[in-house]
Amino acid sequence: MKQKFKRAILYARQHRANQEVNESLHRLVDFLSTQDIEIFQDSDTAASFELKTPVLPREKMGEKHDLIIVVGGDGSLLSASRMAIKVNTPVIGINRGRLGFLTDILPQDIESHLGPVLNGQYNEEERFLLHTKIYDKENSYFEGDALNDVVLGRGSETHLIEFDVYINQQLVSHYRSDGMILSTPTGSTAYALSAGGPIMHPQLNAIVLVPMFSHSLSSRPLVIDGEAEIELYISKSNETDLRISCDGHESRVVKPGQKVAVKKNGNRLRLLHPLDYHYYDTLRSKLGWESKHQG
């Protein structure tokens, strides 16, 4: 049996401040109160929901046997992951979103699935994040992390943008396209998939680069070593500023002539699942794959 948990930290985003999320949060509080668990909420949760539980400062998280319980969709868990890796605290999700690739537990299964997890009966995965930096010769302008993907986009530019991709200081190619998606295996079922990228098992140590509407028909998704260091050199021929976003959340300007460095973050997300979780079951149900021969 694995680590049992002594404290639960409830996390929900303001973006998800609706009746369904509120109902699940209160149901969690009622259930956790019967489990000999100290109950706290994150500051983001307290700003949007009226729970009668104390706020645990983020610098205090991870000091005991803590578990972050996310209520919402995959976007909420992506947001929580950037906090969780800094305090080495595991995360599990209650799905109140749409697809729910990362949030395993259905609202009606809170008691039956979360109870065993609290008592040390769960599967734990480590998922890596990408660390991103925008810089030039003089300054560093932005640093951010992404569990799913880092996306270079056109911003306000109406034409194809131009940039060079280097991997481990070796030129890969010059691109003219709408942008580039750099995805982890976790993010391979998100934006990268819609752009034609491959589905990668989450335990692969790999990164996929997916060009967006490239001008070249030979420009295809490229799967590379997860330990590689990637640099995007933004061409000075671009007429306006471009944008870099991390998980579609943190978006920053990147100017012509600047560089974007992307590599694996040294810290990993500890993502928990109930014991009956299976990755291929999730793929089949979320993507609508057939479960048996129909002949």
Curated annotation (Swiss-Prot):
Extract one GO cellular component term from the record. cytoplasm
**HAMAP family in UniProt:** NAD_kinase (MF_00361)
Keyword Ligase (UniProt): no
Q: Which cofactor does it need?
A: a divalent metal cation
- What family does this chain come from, according to its entry? Belongs to the NAD kinase family.
What reaction does this catalyse?
NAD(+) + ATP = ADP + NADP(+) + H(+)
Gene symbol of the encoding locus: nadK
Q: Which organism is it from?
A: Legionella pneumophila (strain Corby)
Places the protein is found? Cytoplasm
Q: What are this entry's molecular-function GO terms?
A: ATP binding; metal ion binding; NAD binding; NAD+ kinase activity
Q: Which taxonomic lineage is given here?
A: Bacteria, Pseudomonadati, Pseudomonadota, Gammaproteobacteria, Legionellales
Q: What main location does UniProt list?
A: cytoplasm
The cross-references to Pfam families, in alphabetical order and at most eight, read:
NAD_kinase, NAD_kinase_C
Q: Where does NAD(+) bind?
A: 74-75, 148-149, 159, 176, 178, 189-194
| Annotated function | Involved in the regulation of the intracellular balance of NAD and NADP, and is a key enzyme in the biosynthesis of NADP. Catalyzes specifically the phosphorylation on 2'-hydroxyl of the adenosine moiety of NAD to yield NADP.
EC number(s) stated in the UniProt entry for this protein: 2.7.1.23
Q: What is this protein called?
A: NAD kinase
**GO biological process terms on file:** NAD metabolic process; NADP biosynthetic process
Active-site residue list: 74
The family database entries (Gene3D superfamilies) matched by this protein are listed as: Probable inorganic polyphosphate/atp-NAD kinase, domain 1 (3.40.50.10330), Probable inorganic polyphosphate/atp-NAD kinase, domain 2 (2.60.200.30)
Going by the UniProt record, its keywords in alphabetical order are:
ATP-binding, Cytoplasm, Kinase, NAD, NADP, Nucleotide-binding, Transferase
